[in-house]
Amino acid sequence: ILLAWLVERTAIPARAWIGNLILVPMTVPSLLSAIAWVQLLDPRNGLVNVVLRSLFGLQSDTGPFDIYTLSGMCFVQGLRLVPSAYLMIAASFRAMDPSLEEQSAMAGQNVAQTTLRVTLPIMRPALLAALIYFIIVVIESFDIPGLLGFTARIRVLSTAIYWATHSEVGLPDYGLASALGAIILVVALMLMWGYQRLT
């Protein structure tokens, strides 16, 4: 939201360049992006960790950062979603009439009051649509949780479906995989129902 606001509602220098640079990560496949983060933040031989251990004289063979955690997966997935979020929110800012914010300012409202009383209510449908999109993308995403989560045996919904159909011992459990897939469908339907109620 902040990046979209800066590019669409302020006169910062090179804002067109900033808007284009935000979209560059969309050109990189998510699996390749996850591999790049592994090269940087692998706890044993990631470039950032090796440099930090040598700079600060840390005696540990691992860390200080570990990409193979749930927070690491959230970090990488979150960065992957920034360009999409920017596109959705920036389009909403672009379509909104700036004179509404100007009238609020002329009525004596400060920036925070204008944001809470004018900007956010107008942008609520776009913000909710973006939120629903991101929740569904995160739930169904497999490549980043697969690469980062398999190593640490962290299972999320998408990887749990994979493990149910690729059992290490015995036959695949297609019933469990179907039930887990139905959870994604139920979540998507509930989000759409909530969107209809709130907009």
Residue ranges of model-derived segments:
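Short helix-to-coil transition segments within interhelical loops
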Residues: T10, M96-M123
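Membrane-interface segments at the starts/ends of alpha-helical transmembrane spans
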Residues: D61-D66, W163-G175
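Amphipathic alpha-helical segments in well-structured domains
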Residues: L21, V48-N49, A112, I154, ...
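Glycine-rich helix-loop "coupling/hinge" segments at transmembrane-helix boundaries
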Residues: D143-G170
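Membrane-water interface segments at the C-terminal ends of transmembrane alpha-helices
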Residues: I1-R94, I122-D143, L147, A177-Q196
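Short amphipathic alpha-helical coupling elements at transmembrane boundaries
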Residues: G19-I22, V50-G57, P98-M106, R117, ...
